Amino acid sequence: MKHRWLWMVGVVLPAILVAQTAPGAEAQSERGPFARIASLRPLEGQTVDFEAGYIRHLAWHQQAKDTWAWYGWSIWAGERQRWFVYATFGHSAAGLDSPVAPADDERDNVLNVAPHVEYVGNALYEYLPGLSRGTGAPQPTAKLEFTTIDLAPGTAKAFEEALRAGQSKLEGETLWYRMVAGGTFPRYVRLRPRPNLSAILNDGSETLPDEVDHLIAKTTIEILSLRPTMSFGLTLVGK
């Protein structure tokens, strides 16, 4: 009887553990349209310590077998120069509810990153394939044109319709996202990954259509530089 009981424990307990852990792991890798884009500002005189701590934090993600890809950029041109932007793309809603070991992630983040930065923004976005040219996750190129557009209230539908009408004319990778939480609404973000500054400056084909000018309250255009050592899970272009 004792041996039979041990056999039952050996069969049933692993099955229970699998049932408890498998759904979360499956949800974490489930693809979808949602992205998280966040930004932080290194404290005065602590940029070196921040970058070293952030790299250590990414090592935690690797050890935890995180399946998400994390992009890291420094803002090169814009009023937020030298701030840091990090993002992850292509998640389902269930996936966003199932990050890898969130309590341990937060503990490591507080230890390695938080002492050296001010957290200044964190928002969720939905990718809009009907307005875009690309997959919803930007190519990890050396440069990224990052455009933020705040609309006048009640103009989102007209704005999207105008962009949808011009979608077939897009020539380079152009990714549009609608903010769903985390800032002024309605807000849209356009990402244009490019290999260098020349590709951004010499490309005049991606201007917004004239018919949306009166819908826009504010437009901010920044140029970001990819930080490969401060990114995780990316296959770099040209590598």
Regions found by a protein language model. Give the residues of each.
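Short S/T/G/P-rich N-terminal loop/turn motif that feeds into the first structured element of a domain
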Residues: A19-K239
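Positively charged n-region of N-terminal signal peptides that target proteins for export
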Residues: M1-R4
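Bacterial N-terminal signal peptides
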Residues: M8-V18
